[in-house]
Regions:
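Hydrophobic core
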Residues: 14-22
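Terminal low-complexity/disordered tails
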Residues: 28-36, 43-51, 294-507, 520-521, ...
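N-terminal non-catalytic accessory region
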Residues: 30-208, 214-269, 383-486, 600-609
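Short, solvent-exposed loop/turn segments enriched in Ser/Thr/Gly
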Residues: 504-512, 551-552, 560-571
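Asparagine-centered strand-capping/turn motif at beta-strand->loop junctions
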Residues: 514-519
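Short, hydrophobic/aromatic beta-strand segments
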Residues: 520-528
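Short, solvent-exposed loop/linker segments at beta-strand-coil boundaries, enriched for Pro/Gly
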Residues: 529-541
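Terminal connector regions
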Residues: 562-598
Length: 635
């Protein structure tokens, strides 16, 4: 049969076009971005990604969390936000009158979260968006979907601020189904990071994770040790080894919420300085706990009891007991297998995993928070949500107490890793030299504390910070600067509650900085004292500080012969109609072995020598004067 030359020519042309297309796409994919900034991938925590249910026509319907307006509509109240709406409903109907409507509302809200006995989803649930190309800041903005970004305007680092630094097309938010086993989601993260690199023309990305998102990131690092997609990894208030809060909610024991902590966390989340203590005048603690316990056990747990991620987040001390009372070894065998893969994997090898990443060249950083009891009632040093020991591996004194005077650092690291208030020993931490601790700061809430926010941004976007001992602005142990902390006292030489000494007779500074942290109210400082008299503060009369204003207060005192602990107490009052007299304590340590940078370290050596000589001369003259006084007394 005679061949048609036209067909042959057409085939050659088509083949050539296809070949050129392949070369063009390969060249495009191989084009490297020379912007000088790694793309950033952000991983949020529990409940942050909006979940949706696939409909028969292929569309997605938002199911959790439901829109606030929908909840308020179900509540039957007109209010600007959910908290105000619930308070309004309580005021209208009282605790007895809201049981039925609340039961119906809560049940309908949590039902889409239901999972089967084997830990798979009962409904066809997926994140509301997925894929790198759909979850960049550029895509969120272009598609008018910024309201779908987790933690919009709260807690998380701000995507838009990062976008201003490195470009909207270089900032991504990994959305995921936070109910699933972290090992399963780690596989999705593995693919997602590869997508981001291909999309942006970069070999590596910087990853910022918070809370449960940090457990996911750690699990990914453990499950995919040969991946090389990451250059920097920041763990912000991470849930790494579990949390008593999750265990407290899953246990069969009565719930005993700490409402002071709960309300303070709520203030921080809402970024408000409003005092919510009036809520407890409406609902006594016992009544509120009974309501919460009843609601949790009868309305929430039936839908969420088989969620693998929750079981993976239980603390290690209570996991086996809670498993024995809540799960069936046969019926839930596959669920338990999923859970224990993660618990026996990354969660049992946290330090090894992080150091393996560091060995590959990844800059790993941890920011943890302390000084707050858990909201769920367990009395342990925490950020309100995650225990310190499970967040960063630290050993802590019993909550409300300090280590005894004869306590020695648990591990010799070559650094002083005991906090100045002697409540935290970070020497046992998962990675102590790359861990920063913020005292009295609540879980997440990066945007609510300017110094914490700045630290996280520097760790994520730069290599400026060598370790937790190398930067004067970011000492390893910091005090919260959030507005709801009211006031802070910091030694001028360290920006912390450590007071190093220069010699046997000389402190590294002779003043503290006292700052009003409120963004809107004046405060009156009436007194500053040290409990054991180590320091005497020069405050002869009360001072008034405007919102955000600082004052330098001088002190005198004799340098203790050995390392010494004391406590500064500030008496103050917010100058508002409802302002009350209040105090805030700051535990501090006078030490000769401070491991961080002091302002003295940044001062030229000849000036330090001159200061020491001047002090020695003053000391000699004082002794001579004392001798002459003694002689004159004999005469």
């Amino acid at each position: 049969m005679k061949k048609n030359p036209f067909k042959r020519i057409l085939c050659i042309v088509i083949a050539a076009v296809m070949l050129c297309s392949v070369f063009a796409s390969t060249a495009a994919a191989a084009t490297k971005c020379a912007c000088g900034h790694s793309p950033v991938v952000m991983i949020s925590g529990f409940g942050a990604t909006i979940l949706s249910e696939k409909q028969e026509d292929g569309s997605l319907k938002r199911v959790f969390p439901p829109d606030t307006k929908e909840i308020l509509k179900l509540l039957g109240v007109n209010a600007p936000d959910l908290v105000t709406g619930i308070i309004k409903l309580l005021a209208q109907k009282g605790t007895d009158g809201i049981e039925k409507p609340m039961r119906e509302i809560i049940t309908s809200i949590v039902e889409p979260l239901r999972m089967n006995d084997d830990g798979t989803s009962y409904y066809d649930i997926v994140p509301i968006l997925s894929g790198a190309k759909n979850t960049s800041l550029e895509a969120f903005t272009k598609n008018d979907q910024l309201d779908l970004v987790p933690y919009t305007g709260s807690e998380f680092l701000d995507m838009e601020v990062i976008g201003d630094e490195i470009g909207d097309d270089h900032v991504f938010n990994f959305l995921y189904d936070w109910r699933l086993s972290h090992a399963d989601v780690a596989a999705q993260l593995h693919d997602y990071l590869a997508e981001v690199c291909a999309l942006t023309g970069h070999d590596k990305v910087s990853v910022y994770s918070i809370s449960q998102g940090s457990l996911l990131l750690g699990t990914y690092m453990y499950e995919y040790p040969n991946d090389n997609y990451i250059d920097r990894a920041v763990f912000d208030t991470p849930l790494l080894a579990g949390s008593n809060l999750v265990s407290d909610l899953y246990t069969d024991k009565p719930l005993a919420l700490n409402f002071d902590t709960t309300l303070d966390i709520l203030r921080a989340i809402l970024h408000t300085e409003t005092d919510f203590s009036f809520v407890m005048d409406i609902i006594p603690a016992d009544g509120a706990n009974n309501i919460a316990d009843y609601g949790l056990k009868s309305m929430v747990l039936p839908s969420v009891i088989n969620i693998p991620a929750f079981w993976e987040m239980c603390d290690p001390e209570n996991y086996e007991y809670i498993k024995s009372v809540r799960l069936d070894s046969v019926k839930n065998a596959k669920l338990i297998e999923k859970v224990e893969k993660v618990r026996n994997g990354f969660m049992s090898h946290i330090s090894e995993t992080l150091y393996a990443q560091q060995k590959k060249g990844v800059s790993v950083s941890i920011k943890a928070c302390s000084g707050v009891p858990l909201a769920s009632g367990t009395v342990d040093n925490s950020d309100g949500i995650v225990n310190m020991r499970y967040s960063c591996g630290a050993v802590c004194a019993p909550f409300g107490k300090t280590f005894p005077a004869d306590y020695n650092q648990a591990v010799k690291t070559g650094k002083n890793n005991i906090s100045p208030d002697r409540t935290v020993d970070l020497s046992t931490g998962y990675m102590p030299e790359r861990t920063w601790v913020v005292n009295r700061h609540y879980h997440g809430q990066a945007e609510w504390d300017p110094r914490t926010y700045s630290l996280l941004m520097d760790l994520l976007l730069t290599d400026n910070i060598k370790d937790a001992y190398s930067h004067i602005e970011y000492p390893q142990f910091m005090e919260s600067l959030s507005p709801t902390s009211d006031v802070v006292v910091l030694f001028k030489s360290t920006n912390s509650s450590f007071l190093p000494t220069l010699s046997k007779h000389l402190f590294s500074c002779n003043s503290v900085m006292v700052k009003n942290l409120s963004k809107k109210d004046k405060i009156k400082i009436s007194s500053i004292t040290s409990e054991n008299g180590t320091l005497n503060f020069a405050l002869p009369y009360p001072i008034v500080l405007e919102a955000g204003e600082s004052a330098e207060i001088a002190f005198t005192g004799k340098v203790p012969a050995t390392e010494s602990y004391d406590k500064i107490t500030v008496a103050y009052k917010r100058m508002t109609v409802t302002g009350k007299d209040a105090t805030r304590d700051f535990g501090f340590t006078v030490t000769r072995s401070y491991s961080g940078v002091t302002k003295i370290d940044l001062t030229p050596a000849y000036i330090i020598t001159a200061i020491r000589i001047a002090h020695d001369i003053r000391d000699i003259l004082a002794r001579i004067d004392a001798i002459f006084s003694f002689i004159n007394g004999i005469k």
